[in-house]
Amino acid sequence: MESANASTSATTIDQLCKTFNLSMHTLQINCVFCKNALTTAEIYSYAYKQLKVLFRGGYPYAACACCLEFHGKINQYRHFDYAGYATTVEEETKQDILDVLIRCYLCHKPLCEVEKVKHILTKARFIKLNCTWKGRCLHCWTTCMEDMLP
């Protein structure tokens, strides 16, 4: 894959595929952390989560699901600022909570309205990591709750 054109224009999986006239199913891309090739499911998931493609040494990289979760947990421990309810997020950002881009702190998916409302209804806090508000998506919320059950 010739990288000069891609590194300047492609920032997402979709753009990378368009630049090189590939389908996501045929795209081969490695994880920036562990260097393993992402599975087709991980590539689709990465695109769905609207995560950016990184360029290292002129080549595009993404992150596999395992490394995304691992680095999400590391980020939680290293860069935790504080936690706050939806009202805190709104006061700080001066935006309605539904308009604020909040990602899941484990899988990095942008939270939808339902997930943000669940935080509000259950009085769950959002957390601020490295100056960015994070929460839990429904998938990771369920996974976290399963770990707490006997």
UniProtKB/Swiss-Prot annotation:
Gene3D superfamilies, per database record: E6 early regulatory protein
Primary localization: host cell
GO terms, molecular function: DNA binding; zinc ion binding
Zinc-finger among keywords: yes
Domain of life: Viruses
Single GO cellular component term: host cell nucleus
Entry keywords, A to Z: Activator, DNA-binding, Early protein, Host cytoplasm, Host nucleus, Host-virus interaction, Inhibition of host innate immune response by virus, Metal-binding, Modulation of host cell apoptosis by virus, Transcription, Transcription regulation, Viral immunoevasion, Zinc, Zinc-finger
Compartment(s) of residence: Host cytoplasm; Host nucleus
Zinc finger residue ranges, unnamed: 31-67, 104-140
rRNA processing found in the keyword field: no
Gene Ontology BP term (one): regulation of DNA-templated transcription
Pfam families assigned: E6
Subunit field text: Forms homodimers. Interacts with ubiquitin-protein ligase UBE3A/E6-AP; this interaction stimulates UBE3A ubiquitin activity. Interacts with host TP53 and EP300; this interaction inhibits TP53 activity. Interacts with human ZYX.
Additional information: Belongs to the low risk human alphapapillomavirus family. The cancer-causing human papillomavirus E6 protein has a unique carboxy terminal PDZ domain containing substrate but low risk E6s do not possess this domain.
Record-stated family: Belongs to the papillomaviridae E6 protein family.
Function: Plays a major role in the induction and maintenance of cellular transformation. E6 associates with host UBE3A/E6-AP ubiquitin-protein ligase and modulates its activity. Sequesters tumor suppressor TP53 in the host cytoplasm and modulates its activity by interacting with host EP300 that results in the reduction of TP53 acetylation and activation. In turn, apoptosis induced by DNA damage is inhibited. E6 also protects host keratinocytes from apoptosis by mediating the degradation of host BAK1. May also inhibit host immune response.
Name listed for the protein in its UniProt record: Protein E6
Lineage: Viruses, Monodnaviria, Shotokuvirae, Cossaviricota, Papovaviricetes
Gene assigned in the entry: E6
